[in-house]
Swiss-Prot record:
Domain Dynamin-type G: residue ranges: 31-304
Protein name in UniProt: Interferon-induced GTP-binding protein Mx1
Residue span of region G4 motif: 211-214
Assigned keywords, A-Z: Cytoplasm, GTP-binding, Nucleotide-binding
Protein family per UniProt: Belongs to the TRAFAC class dynamin-like GTPase superfamily. Dynamin/Fzo/YdjA family.
Sequence segments annotated as region (G2 motif): 66-68
Organism: Oncorhynchus mykiss
GO CC annotation: microtubule; nucleus; perinuclear region of cytoplasm; plasma membrane; presynapse
Region called G3 motif, residue ranges: 142-145
CDD domains reported for this sequence: DLP_1 (cd08771)
Positions annotated to bind GTP: 41-48, 142-146, 211-214
Region (G5 motif): 243-246
Keyword Transmembrane helix: no
C-alpha cells in the first residue's frame, strides 16, 4: 500500500477493521450479520494463491477441497521493522504461531479437528490473525472452493454442502462477495459468479477477481480487458486482475516478494493487459488497496444499521431473560427465600386474578371476561326459557285445570295447578345451571394452570405440585358448588316471595297484557261465561312468579359459581401452596430446574453480555 494511502487512512482504516474483528471475536455474528468480505471461487480458480499473495503466508493447497472450513483471515499491518506475528483460534483452542512456515500445517490440523480427517467440510470458523509490515489492513473470510463432482471419500452431495455454506455467508446484505475467476475459462459459466448473482443481481456488493492471466489463449486477451472494463458481466464494484505464483514458481521457491515484482513486470510489459495496470486494475498491491478501501467504506456504511440491530437484539434478549427469571441461588438460605418469593408471587397473582385486579407478574390473564360472557349466556337462557314457558302455558293450564280442578266454581284460581307448573318449569333449569357451573369451573382451572406455567417456568416439580393442587381443588370446589346449586334449586321449589314483590310483578305483567290487547277484548274475555278468564288469570300469575324466580336465579347461580369456583378456589390454592413451604425436605426437589431452561438462560446471559460489550465498542468507536 502506498504512503499516501497509509497517511490518509492511518487513523481510520485499522480502527474500523479492528472494531468489526472485535465484534466477531465476541461471537456477535451468532446474533447479527457483520460487514465482511467473503472469498468464493470454483475449485482451482486460484483463490488460495490470491489469499497467499495478500497475507504473505502459505495456505493449504492441493487437488480437491483444500479449504474445508470458513477461514477468517485477519491481516494487521505493522510498522517497518516489527516482527511477524501469527495466531490461530477455533472453538475453545487458541495458539500463537511463531513461524510463518507453520501456518499451513496449523490450518490443516484445525480443519482435521473440526471437519474430520479427510475431505469433509464444517460450518465452524477458523480464525487466523497475521501481523506483519508486509500485509494490508484487511479481514477476509475464505470459503471452500465449489466442487462440481464428488471424489473418492467425499459424500455424494458435497457440492450442495459447499454451496449451502457459501450461501449462508454471501446472502447477508452485510457481506461483499469477492469472486475469483480464472482468465482461461468462460466467466459466464463459473458457478461462483452465478451464486453471487443469485443473491446480488445488481452486483452492488460483488467484486470480481480475474486470475491466471498468463494462461489466456492468444487472441482472447481483449475479452479479458473487456471483462475488467465491466463490459461483459456488469458488477457495480467492478473487477481486478492479478497474477500469483504458479505451481512451477512455488516448486522453484520463488518468494512472495519476488512474485509481486514479477507480477508487476508481467502487466507493465503485456501488449494487451498493460492498460489495466495503468488504470489501477491490476496487481496484488492494487487489489489490497481496493479491498481495504471497500471494506472500510462498507463498515462505515453498515455501522448505523448495526447499532440499531444491537439495540433491538438487546431489547429482545432482556425480554426473553425476564421470561426465564433469574434462576435459584446457590446458598441454601437464599434458596428458601427464592422459593418463598416465587410461591408468594404466584398465590398473590391467583388472588388478584380472582378479584379482577392487575397481576404483579404482568401476565395478561383475565378470567372475568369469560365469566361475564358465560353469566350473560345464563341470563339469556333464563329469558328464552321464560318465552318458551309463556308460549306453552295456555294449553298446559287448560290440561292442568281439567286434571287438578276440584269443587271450585269457575273463575277461582287453582293454586295447586299454579304450584305444579311453576315447579316443573324451575326443575328444567337445574340441568343447564349445573352444566354452566362445570363449563366455568373448567375455564377457571385452565386460567390457573396458565398462571402456574407462567410463574414456574423452568421448575417442573414446582409446576407439577401447583398443577396437582389446582386439579384437586377444582374437583372439590366444583362438587361443593354443584351441591349448593342443587340445594338452591330445591329451595326454589318452595314457591315463595314477599307479598309486595309478587304484587308488583303481577301489576307489571297485567300492565304489559293491557298494552298488548284492546281493553274491550280484555273485558269480554274476563266476563265470558266459560273458564277462559280463569286461564288468563292463571297465566298472568305464572308469568309473574317465573319472572321473580328467574331474576333470583340470574344472580344467585353466578354468585355461587363465582364464590366457590373462583374466589374460594384462589384462597384454597394460596393456603395449600404456602403450606408447601413448611415441608423443608421438599425444597430442593421443588427448586430442581429444567436442564433446558438452565442452559437456555445461560445462553441468553452470555448473549446479553456480548451484545452489551458490542454496544460499548460501538459507543467508544
Amino acid at each position: 500500500m502506498n504512503n499516501t494511502l497509509n497517511q490518509h487512512y492511518e487513523e481510520k482504516v485499522r480502527p474500523c477493521i479492528d472494531l468489526i474483528d472485535s465484534l466477531r471475536s465476541l461471537g456477535v455474528e451468532k446474533d447479527l450479520a457483520l460487514p465482511a468480505i467473503a472469498v468464493i471461487g470454483d475449485q482451482s480458480s486460484g483463490k488460495s494463491s490470491v489469499l497467499e499473495a495478500l497475507s504473505g503466508v502459505a495456505l493449504p493447497r492441493g487437488s480437491g477441497i483444500v479449504t474445508r472450513c470458513p477461514l477468517e483471515l485477519k491481516m494487521k499491518r505493522k510498522k517497518e521493522g516489527e516482527e511477524w506475528h501469527g495466531k490461530i483460534s477455533y472453538q475453545d483452542h487458541e495458539e500463537e504461531i511463531e513461524d510463518p512456515s507453520d501456518v499451513e500445517k496449523k490450518i490443516r490440523e484445525a480443519q482435521d479437528e473440526m471437519a474430520g480427517v479427510g475431505v469433509g467440510i464444517s460450518d465452524d470458523l477458523i480464525s487466523l490473525e497475521i501481523g506483519s509490515p508486509d500485509v494490508p489492513d484487511l479481514t477476509l473470510i475464505d470459503l471452500p472452493g465449489i466442487a462440481r463432482v464428488a471424489v473418492k471419500g467425499q459424500p455424494e452431495n458435497i457440492g450442495e454442502q459447499i454451496k449451502r455454506l457459501i450461501r449462508k455467508f454471501i446472502m447477508k446484505q452485510e457481506t461483499i462477495s469477492l469472486v475469483v475467476v480464472p482468465c482461461n475459462v468462460d466467466i459466464a459459466t463459473t458457478e461462483a459468479l452465478k451464486m453471487a448473482q443469485e443473491v446480488d443481481p445488481e452486483g452492488e456488493r460483488t467484486l470480481g477477481i480475474l486470475t491466471k492471466p498468463d494462461l489466456v489463449d492468444k487472441g482472447t486477451e481483449e475479452t479479458v480487458v473487456d471483462i475488467v472494463h465491466n463490459e461483459v458481466i456488469h458488477l457495480t464494484k467492478g473487477y481486478m486482475i492479478v497474477k500469483c505464483r504458479g505451481q512451477k514458481e512455488i516448486m522453484e521457491r520463488v518468494s512472495l516478494t519476488e512474485a509481486t515484482e514479477r507480477e508487476k513486470a508481467f502487466f507493465k510489459e503485456h501488449a494487451h493487459l498493460s492498460t489495466l495496470y495503468d488504470e489501477g486494475h491490476a496487481t496484488i498491491p492494487k487489489l489490497a488497496e481496493k479491498l481495504t478501501l471497500e471494506l472500510v467504506h462498507h463498515i462505515e456504511k453498515s455501522l448505523p444499521r448495526l447499532e440499531e440491530q444491537i439495540e433491538a437484539k438487546l431489547s429482545e434478549t432482556h425480554a426473553e431473560l425476564e421470561r426465564y427469571g433469574t434462576g435459584p441461588p446457590e446458598d441454601s438460605a437464599e434458596r428458601l427465600y427464592f422459593l418463598i418469593d416465587k410461591v408468594t408471587a404466584f398465590t398473590q397473582d391467583a388472588i388478584n386474578l380472582s378479584t379482577g385486579e392487575e397481576m404483579k407478574s404482568g401476565v395478561r390473564l383475565n378470567v372475568f371476561s369469560t365469566l361475564r360472557k358465560e353469566f350473560g349466556k345464563w341470563k339469556l337462557h333464563l329469558e328464552r326459557s321464560g318465552e318458551i314457558f309463556n308460549q306453552r302455558i295456555e294449553g298446559e293450564v287448560d290440561d292442568y285445570e281439567k286434571t287438578y280442578r276440584g269443587r271450585e266454581l269457575p273463575g277461582f284460581i287453582n293454586y295447586k295447578t299454579f304450584e305444579v307448573m311453576v315447579k316443573d318449569q324451575i326443575k328444567q333449569l337445574e340441568g343447564p345451571a349445573v352444566k354452566k357451573l362445570k363449563e366455568i369451573s373448567d375455564a377457571v382451572r385452565k386460567v390457573f394452570l396458565l398462571l402456574a406455567q407462567s410463574s414456574f417456568t423452568g421448575f417442573p416439580n414446582l409446576l407439577k405440585s401447583a398443577k396437582t393442587k389446582i386439579e384437586a381443588i377444582k374437583q372439590v370446589n366444583e362438587s361443593t358448588a354443584e351441591s349448593m346449586l342443587r340445594t338452591q334449586f330445591k329451595m326454589e321449589l318452595i314457591v315463595y316471595t314477599q307479598d309486595s314483590t309478587y304484587s308488583h310483578s303481577l301489576c307489571e305483567r297485567k300492565r304489559e297484557e293491557d298494552e298488548d290487547q284492546p281493553l274491550t277484548e280484555i273485558r269480554s274475555t274476563i266476563f265470558s261465561t266459560d273458564n277462559h278468564a280463569t286461564l288468563q288469570e292463571m297465566m298472568l300469575h305464572l308469568k309473574s312468579y317465573y319472572w321473580i324466580s328467574s331474576q333470583r336465579l340470574a344472580d344467585q347461580i353466578p354468585m355461587v359459581i363465582r364464590y366457590l369456583v373462583l374466589q374460594e378456589f384462589a384462597s384454597q390454592l394460596q393456603r395449600e401452596m404456602l403450606q408447601t413451604l413448611q415441608e423443608k425436605d421438599n425444597i430442593e426437589q421443588l427448586l430442581k430446574e429444567d436442564i433446558d431452561i438452565g442452559s437456555k438462560r445461560a445462553a441468553l446471559q452470555s448473549k446479553l453480555k456480548r451484545l452489551m460489550k458490542a454496544r460499548s465498542y460501538l459507543v467508544e468507536f
